[in-house]
Amino acid sequence: MPLLDPREVLLRRGIPIPAAASFHVPGLPDLHAESSSSTALAHPLQMSAGYLPARPIEADGQPKDNAHLFFLLLRARHVPAKRKLIIWFNGGPGCSSFDGAMMEVGAWRMDGKGGLVWVKDGASWNEYADILFLDQPAGTGFSYVNTNAYTKSLPQAADEVVHFLEQFVQVYPEYSRDVELEYGSQGSGVDVYLAGESFAGQYIPYTAKAIVKSPKPPVSLKGIAIGNGFIDPKSQYGTELETMVQKNIWTTSSGEYKHVAGLVKACHEELDKSNQREIGKCELILQTIIASTTTKTQGASGYTCINVYDVRLSDSSPACGMNWPTTLPAMYDYLRRPDVRKALHVDEHHKPEAWVECNANVGSAMRTDTTSPPSVQLLPELLDSGVKVLLFAGEEDLICNAIGVQRAAENLEWGGAKGFDDKQPAQDWYVNGTHAGTWRTARNLTYVGIKGASHMVGVDKPIESHDMIVRFMGIDYMKVAGPNALIPSRVGNEPDRVLITGGGGGIAQIGKDGSRVIPGSGKTEEEVAEEARWRAYYDAGSFALMVLLIAVGIGTWLLLRARKQRRLNRNRIGRGGALRLATTTELGASRSTTGNGDTDETSNNHELERLVGGKHVEDDDDDVEEHIFNVGDEDLSDSNGENGPPVVKARHTGSQR
């Protein structure tokens, strides 16, 4: 089916959607280059931001309840053979995806001075894929909706994302599934992946199902990726206690452990009778662990407790992790600046309130949904339909810990079997020569445990998390190049995926300025990449020069060969152009003898001159060139000598070429 012009579609539907140009963001205030502290009002990154409707249009031309979702779109720095789009969700429920954009997988971070700084090459997920950060459900982050009209269920939230995407592909038709249907999947269209963390473990499977089940899916969904997600209450509730023991914070003989173990037992008994996502008795487990770790620090005015997002850290009570990461306060200040809001096209009329990380009203409305089953029940059908699923977990998290996420994967039944089998054991995963974690794949499902990472994997392990998502999406950055092609990476016994190494295959190290340095050369990866680019240009130029020289050589040889052939032809028939045959009478007199019996050589020479057109074979080459291209009238005059017969001479104009 041919694609309609987006304006025609909008006209037919009566939807007032702005042109894509109106969403363009030319720059962000105080976005600094890595090597400079000067304000960067413009930058090489292609970026768009703004609002699109989340609910159907009503009679007044506005969406129901005035629901609009805010989005931030970052384009890829390097484009693979098949383009990719990652749609990013944060959790909560009700937490803004600016967490992901500015602290985890986006292109910049806070610089500690109130501005922004670009992340190091290879750390942002938009290196090889476009990323769409989405504030959803309506009311989250910069999104807005009428008061008391918040989204109240997971299916509703999913439908609103699908409605948003239907409008999105009208503004940006290159992302539409219609492109792939029209022109084929090889190189045409865009592969779409849903990704996020925490409570997004509920959002994402529901949204994936809504896309797949849509009568006309707006995008071509290929996979979903959930980090430290809450997806399976039966597998995950209670693993908080196991994590406390695994991390050597408690022992099984401690009083705290025994107390919480009783709560875990009561929780599991409740889970056996319920199919709800959140159960009060089970929520008591984490609350009790937090209370048990809360202490008054000597010399401090308040209390501290465990950071539920990173067990290696503590936080002030009652935040217990809500103040983390440490750049969060600066992010609040930045996103509340009027110049930043203006640059991002924030609607001051409908969203006048200051940005907050998590909207409590949105969260409360979503928690009223007690009928939607846990999202884990949607995964088997998605997997069987061909949608790839990645479950990954930072191993230092407590609230949605790696033990629970891995157990959820192992308990899952799909493709005619349960969990992983012995034929596909977990493999060690290495990035930049360091053990990054474990990797296991079976029947479209992949589980990755990330060593040394917290609840927000991208905060602690940006290079590793990016390598993970690139592998999952099947991008071959050996062909695309870019910074990640410089970082050795492998799973199991496969060869390292790396384009350039130094010092006999050494791995990149971290320099004083934070840049990765190639051993054996002392150069940063950026310097090595620049040298590689120049070498590529040099090699391409050398190849072109060789081709040119070969062509000139062949041309010269052909020219000389042609000239030699012309000389040979002239030696045979002369320059007269046409050879007049001698008469039999003339030939009969061609050989006479003198009275003493000797042959008359003078007569022979005279006869030879007549046969070759009146000139000797020793004529120089220049005369050949003088006439070979000349065209003119026939000259029938007799110029062969006093006694010679008339011959036809070559056509010429009398002028030289």
Curated annotation (Swiss-Prot):
<feature type="glycosylation site" description="N-linked (GlcNAc...) asparagine">
    <location>
        <position position="432"/>
    </location>
</feature>
<keyword id="KW-0333">Golgi apparatus</keyword>
<keyword id="KW-0378">Hydrolase</keyword>
<dbReference type="GO" id="GO:0016020">
    <property type="term" value="C:membrane"/>
</dbReference>
<feature type="active site">
    <location>
        <position position="455"/>
    </location>
</feature>
<comment type="similarity">
    <text>Belongs to the peptidase S10 family.</text>
</comment>
<feature type="compositionally biased region" description="Basic and acidic residues">
    <location>
        <begin position="603"/>
        <end position="618"/>
    </location>
</feature>
<protein>
    <recommendedName>
        <fullName>Pheromone-processing carboxypeptidase KEX1</fullName>
        <ecNumber>3.4.16.6</ecNumber>
    </recommendedName>
</protein>
<dbReference type="InterPro" id="IPR001563">
    <property type="entry name" value="Peptidase_S10"/>
</dbReference>
<comment type="function">
    <text>Protease with a carboxypeptidase B-like function involved in the C-terminal processing of the lysine and arginine residues from protein precursors. Promotes cell fusion and is involved in the programmed cell death.</text>
</comment>
<keyword id="KW-1133">Transmembrane helix</keyword>
<dbReference type="GO" id="GO:0006915">
    <property type="term" value="P:apoptotic process"/>
</dbReference>
<dbReference type="InterPro" id="IPR029058">
    <property type="entry name" value="AB_hydrolase_fold"/>
</dbReference>
<feature type="topological domain" description="Cytoplasmic">
    <location>
        <begin position="561"/>
        <end position="657"/>
    </location>
</feature>
<feature type="compositionally biased region" description="Polar residues">
    <location>
        <begin position="584"/>
        <end position="597"/>
    </location>
</feature>
<feature type="active site">
    <location>
        <position position="198"/>
    </location>
</feature>
<dbReference type="GO" id="GO:0004185">
    <property type="term" value="F:serine-type carboxypeptidase activity"/>
</dbReference>
<keyword id="KW-0812">Transmembrane</keyword>
<dbReference type="Pfam" id="PF00450">
    <property type="entry name" value="Peptidase_S10"/>
</dbReference>
<feature type="active site">
    <location>
        <position position="397"/>
    </location>
</feature>
<feature type="transmembrane region" description="Helical">
    <location>
        <begin position="540"/>
        <end position="560"/>
    </location>
</feature>
<dbReference type="GO" id="GO:0006508">
    <property type="term" value="P:proteolysis"/>
</dbReference>
<feature type="glycosylation site" description="N-linked (GlcNAc...) asparagine">
    <location>
        <position position="444"/>
    </location>
</feature>
<keyword id="KW-0472">Membrane</keyword>
<keyword id="KW-0645">Protease</keyword>
<keyword id="KW-0053">Apoptosis</keyword>
<feature type="region of interest" description="Disordered">
    <location>
        <begin position="584"/>
        <end position="657"/>
    </location>
</feature>
<keyword id="KW-0121">Carboxypeptidase</keyword>
<keyword id="KW-0325">Glycoprotein</keyword>
<dbReference type="GO" id="GO:0005802">
    <property type="term" value="C:trans-Golgi network"/>
</dbReference>
<keyword id="KW-0732">Signal</keyword>
